[in-house]
Amino acid sequence: MIAITLPDGSRREFPGPVTVAEVAQSIGAGLAKAALAGRIDGQLVDTSFRIEQNVDLAIVTDKDTDGLDVIRHSTAHLLAYAVKELYPEAQVTIGPVIENGFYYDFAYKRPFTPEDLVAIEKRMAELAKKDEKVTREVWSRDDAVKLFEGMGEKYKAEIIASIPEDQEIGLYREGNFVDLCRGPHVPSTGKLKVFKLMKVAGAYWRGDSNNEMLQRIYGTAWAKKEDQEAYLHMLEEAEKRDHRKLGKLLDLFHLQEEAPGMVFWHPKGWQIWQAVEQYMRGRLAGAGYSEVRTPQVMDRGLWERSGHWENYKENMFVTESEKREYAIKPMNCPGHVQIFNHGLRSYRDLPLRLAEFGACHRNEPSGALHGLMRVRGFVQDDAHIFCTEGQIMAEAKDFNDLAFSIYEDFGFENVAVKLALRPDKRAGTDEIWDHAEEGLRTALRACGVEWEELPGEGAFYGPKVEYHIKDAIGRSWQCGTLQLDLVLPERLGAEYVAEDNSRKRPVMLHRAILGSFERFLGILLENHAGALPLWLAPEQVVIMSIADAHAEYAESVAQSLQKQGFRASADLRNEKITYKIREHSLQKVPYLVVVGDKERDGNQVAVRARGNVDLGSMPVSTFVERLQNDFANKS
């Protein structure tokens, strides 16, 4: 007998081997029809998978996150199937699932056009409607290479040839199409009902710019039509909110080819930056951090000792001077350890919290650069906490509380927490990693937050807690991190004198809340569609005179507001007041003030809040109270 334990704890027994699909059928016809895959002892498998021993089994449907991934993965294969049907000379390469969709890379003699995408999508729908069965076959590596070479698929043959000889090769077949894949896939193409091809872009074979340029077709796929429509609506809204467009419209910043991935901040954009930095500086000081500054360029030897040279060199800018090799820092942590090491530290000095608005540079691929969101030169709200093991829990809780409070001030109240675990390429022993990972789990439990675990996503020197904020249109952005590092203090010789006079290694907590300033400002701009709250707005108030006779009064109001700390200016141009209002409204200024005879003679101001909300006339003192209240409430 084979016993199958289901997620609710119930057991079903079968006299012999049974497939996932057969188990689903035994539970109910509805579940059997909805089944897309199975999860056996945590491992995803096809519905055709044959169970030959006692296992824990969950039936995966489109209601599961895994189910959506199976749909998207299968739709990527459907895309390749359709392309091969329409363009037999095209060669297939790879087609993974990505956030909200999938892509597939093709080698073809000419660029795919928008008209081609329409034709391909139509063919995909036809193939899905045929409801062809998707089957898995197991091949030897060499036979699989011969199969794809015989079909003229040199890229696929190259991928398979790089797999160890003793490893079995999984191929999936649907109709006339066969492809290499680990799976799982939907049981038949009829399960794929909601999809759309989005765009085509260039991509190098194996991500290497020395290789051939391929064509990458992006698509999205969903379980329900309404989910796809909501996603497409979100994309339309995101297009309107694109921070690159807002940066140009509002004259905040620009980028240019002479400095790829580096930002030219204009006065108004820099004003936003300074508002954020001053706010963060105050919050950090209040939380017991000391601000420091470390060098931009440091000798290769330090990066070798820290482990960055071995694990991170491909992302570092390297230079040479007087026969010495240097690296421009990609992160601040080794520099902060040098400050910790300068002088003898006692347990009484701990926890020591060192913060730096540190300018870093990383050699990101040019194709990955994207406005403020992905740059080569950036500033982090970086800090490192040196503490004892006994202090980890309290420090993690304090940081968690600080991070949530700061996100709330910036208007982000939906925050998800994730724990990224050890990657394949890492420093330190498994014992150290076990200790570090469990330390963060314990700290998160103490914070009372729920979290999701991400295997393989940690930094090379330690696991990390990630803070993902959700914006106004439902997108998730990873900003803050808390990383527990037992490796770097060891490698760089950090130590303190313990209470018993012995020398001990401190625990090092790497932490950031905003991440990079550039990216966070891009997120802020898109979240607010450029209409930043008063405390962040580069121009908070514009006072507009109706005629020349009101210019002196308008100027005096502006100067009064400036003396009280507000970013105010006077527009005294000889233009129609409606023109001025429209112009400054497009600049998304929070408050527009109009002054004429009535306002001048009564020491009042006529106020319009952003969005053309007429607040009427009021004394200047009343308006100042409103500004102060908005500022205090971060509204």
UniProtKB/Swiss-Prot annotation:
Q: Where does Zn(2+) bind?
A: 333, 384, 510
Domain TGS: residue ranges: 1-61
InterPro entries attached to this UniProt entry: aa-tRNA-synt_IIb, aa-tRNA-synth_II, aa-tRNA-synth_II/BPL/LPL, Anticodon-bd, Anticodon-bd_dom_sf, Beta-grasp_dom_sf, TGS, TGS-like
Which cofactors, if any, are listed as required? Zn(2+)
Gene Ontology cellular-component terms listed? cytosol
Which GO BP annotation is one of this protein's?
A: threonyl-tRNA aminoacylation
Q: Where in the cell is it found?
A: Cytoplasm
Q: Cite the SMART domains for this sequence.
A: tRNA_SAD
Q: Which UniProt keywords apply?
A: Aminoacyl-tRNA synthetase, ATP-binding, Cytoplasm, Ligase, Metal-binding, Nucleotide-binding, Protein biosynthesis, RNA-binding, tRNA-binding, Zinc
Q: Where is region (Catalytic) located?
A: 242-533
Enzyme Commission no? 6.1.1.3
| GO terms assigned for molecular function | ATP binding; metal ion binding; threonine-tRNA ligase activity; tRNA binding
Q: How is the cofactor bound?
A: Binds 1 zinc ion per subunit.
Q: Which superkingdom?
A: Bacteria
Q: Per the annotation, which location comes first and is thus the protein's main one?
A: cytoplasm
Classification via CDD domains: TGS_ThrRS, ThrRS_anticodon, ThrRS_core
Catalyzed reactions:
tRNA(Thr) + L-threonine + ATP = L-threonyl-tRNA(Thr) + AMP + diphosphate + H(+)
Matching entries from PANTHER family are given as:
THREONINE--TRNA LIGASE, CHLOROPLASTIC_MITOCHONDRIAL 2, THREONINE-TRNA LIGASE
Assembly and interactions?
A: Homodimer.
Query: NCBIfam families per the record?
Result: thrS
Biological function: Catalyzes the attachment of threonine to tRNA(Thr) in a two-step reaction: L-threonine is first activated by ATP to form Thr-AMP and then transferred to the acceptor end of tRNA(Thr). Also edits incorrectly charged L-seryl-tRNA(Thr).
The entry assigns this protein to a family as follows: Belongs to the class-II aminoacyl-tRNA synthetase family.
Indicate what this protein is called per its UniProt record. Answer: Threonine--tRNA ligase
Q: Which organism is it from?
A: Ralstonia nicotianae (strain ATCC BAA-1114 / GMI1000)
Q: Gene symbol?
A: thrS
